[in-house]
Amino acid sequence: MGIFMPLQLNFATSRAASHRVLGALFLSGLVLCGTLAHAARVCDVTAYGAKGDGAAKDTRAIQDAIDACAAKGGGTVRLAAGTFLTGPLVLKSHITLEVDAGATLLGSQDRADYPEVQELRERALQPLLSATHAEHIVIRGGGAIDGNGKPWWDAVYAHRGAPNFTAALRPRLLLLDRCKHVLIENVTIQNSASWQVVPYYSDDVVIRNGKILAPARSPNTDGIDPFSSSHVRISHMLIDTGDDNIAIKSGQPNSPGPDSPSTDITITDCTFLHGHGMSMGSEIAGGVQRVRAARIHFKDTASGVRIKSNRDRGGDIGNFDFRDLTMEDVGTPILITEYYPRIPPHDTAQPVTRLTPHFHDIHIRNLKATGAKEAGIIVGLPESPITTVTLDHVEIAAQKGITVSDATVTAHDFSVTAAAGDPYTMLENAKIDRK
């Protein structure tokens, strides 16, 4: 994913320097030729025994195709038309997984196919697709990757709250563990048992021109969760899920540390339908910095911009620029809270710790929302008020107004129309400075 720049030669250089330049060009040519060779190598999974009939498990055949391509330096593992039933698969460096239009990679519903592993510092089941310490991975093709997660969702609803509930362990659909240079494009990812796409401690991840889907009531089916990752670019995605459409994370509740931040993330030209919105948190002990979002349309999401944490999982959160957002029938267009998941009616300041959230420098420009239930919530902790929130050209029509507590907001051309009650409710240590 580099940019080739023209090489300017100084013909007055010494012969030795010229030889070094020519040598570099020769090596670059070898690298380019090797890359083209990798791209040209195709391992069709049917040649390794895959049936694609939706009944026989094709796990071994598909993994054999991945391993064979990787052993030769990389290539394309191709799934043509058909339904390829599989357990967990492990991707390798320099592999393109191409799921053609008309093909579905379908996750097995057999719990025994998913070994228990340590993942994100906790117990989990092996993801349907994963890669560890890998680079230059591509997933594309116009087809679908389906986690087939309904049995896990049903188990969660049947046993939620029960002690020692082992069915709470569910496989994620795609985990990129300490990977770099990843491209996911033109593919539908759907119906994961749990979080769908998780870049974990990864760098340079591009996700574009696709769909991520799950039923509105499917539990914890987050669309994309960058976790302690950097340089993640998400664009032209339709995300319709049962939980956060996107949730940027870093760290775990009560994390002992150390934790790394998520940084330099851009989200552009996307549509978010059912789900909990464009979220930061709640697990952000490592912090989240430099997030940019533009030209996002929200329809029927529970929240729009959602920044959430609490005293047992917070960190330094800020330098966000969100602009050109449109929202229809969104529950709460702006939800910024250091009291996730519930805001108490009364509270007093607590000692500041390593996990106390600190929200700052959150800038929202050109937002228009209609049909909202509650215009907004901006509520900080008394020991860590939210600072430097700017609302510029923001217009919200809602049933209820906006509530601000332990937060300082600067507003320019900010309008809230509430069908009932006061459009602005200012509680303890709250300030809206209108410019």
Feature locations, PLM:
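Bacterial N-terminal signal peptides
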Residues: 22-34
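Intrinsically disordered, low-complexity Ser/Thr- and Pro-rich stretches
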Residues: 5-9, 23, 412
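Extracellular/periplasmic carbohydrate-active domains that bind, remodel
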Residues: 36-435
